[in-house]
Design a protein with these regions (language model features):
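Thiol/disulfide oxidoreductase modules built on the thioredoxin-like
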Residues: 79-84, 90-138
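A short beta-strand-turn-helix
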Residues: 8-30, 98
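N-terminal targeting signals for export/organelle localization
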Residues: 1-12, 122, 138, 142-144
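C-type cytochrome heme c attachment motif
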Residues: 37-44, 110
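Structural microenvironment flanking redox-active thiols in thiol-disulfide oxidoreductases
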Residues: 43-82, 92-98
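Aromatic-flanked redox-active Cys/Sec active sites in thiol-based oxidoreductases
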Residues: 33-38, 68
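Conserved hydrophobic/aromatic "anchor" residues
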Residues: 9, 34-35, 77, 85
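Hydrophobic beta-strand anchors of alpha/beta hydrolase catalytic cores
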Residues: 31-32, 63
Length: 144
């Protein structure tokens, strides 16, 4: 999957608006983190993802959360652990967005780094450790 463009992914945000993943933050790399409110390791890494997202400038990596969860569960979770980056929703299953982004094992959390042209640069199965995200994402911040 690295170097390839994933199939188009269009999902609702928390307000029910359909959003094309590739259209978020044009010209910026995307770090797409797939998670769920019931996933312990996902919950543990959310503050680190928020810190990373907040440290990005106008041209930095755009973080996008992709929750394989029910909207109300996600809203309740985000009241406890707020984030400033966009959150999209999908239902878990054999053709969910995580699978379409290359998560063949179906485990969470799962993160994909897309370059400015929305090609897959890197994939990570499992949680980030503190301080790991910036180095991992650095592959997407250079010139294309």
């Amino acid at each position: 999957m690295p170097g390839q463009h994933p199939d188009p992914i269009r999902l609702p945000d928390l307000d029910g608006n359909l959003v094309e993943l590739a259209a978020i933050a044009p010209g910026r790399p995307l770090l797409v983190n797939v998670w769920a409110s019931w996933c312990g390791p996902c919950v543990e890494e959310m503050p680190e993802l928020q810190r990373f997202a907040a440290a990005q400038g106008a041209d930095g990596v755009q973080v996008v959360g992709l929750a394989l969860d029910e909207a109300e569960a996600v809203r309740a979770f985000l009241r406890q652990v707020p984030v400033d980056y966009p959150i999209l929703l999908d239902r878990p299953g054999p053709a969910d967005a995580s699978v379409r982004l290359g998560n063949t094992r179906g485990l969470l959390p799962y993160t994909v780094l897309l370059d400015r042209q929305r090609r897959v640069l890197r994939q990570k199965l499992g949680p980030f450790q503190p301080g790991e995200i910036a180095d991992w994402a650095a592959a997407g911040t250079g010139p294309d």
